[in-house]
Amino acid sequence: GISTTLLHYPTFISDLDFDNAKVWVNEIKASQVLVLDDIGAEQNNAWVRDSILQVILQHRMQENLPTFFTSNLRMEELEQHLAETKRADEIWPAKRVMERVKYLAEEMRLEGTNRRHD
């Protein structure tokens, strides 16, 4: 079978700490197929963006591994979200991450009825 990881990104980030980060990052990097669900809904910070997300995406880009993203944000909005940290508006680190997202994924807008409550 194919190793697939569906990761609710905000939950992953909220559960992540410095001590367990390397183990999680290596496991996610090794997945044959990765789906990062609800990216952009997490509490962003520079460490998560630069040391977690960028490292995962860089590996997946270099290995040409299938990577999917779901988000309520358009690419431009996601870039702005990634730029906003407590320290400042860090547009260049966010642009580096977004270059990897754009390499790995094509933006597709899905519209329709929210069926979560049906």
Task: Show where each model-derived region lies.
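AAA+/P-loop NTPase substrate/partner-engagement loops
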Residues: G1-L34
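Structural recognition of the conserved hydrophobic beta-strand(s) that form the central parallel beta-sheet
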Residues: L6-L7, V35-D37, P66-N72
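Short, basic, glycine/proline-bearing loop/turn elements
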Residues: D38-E42
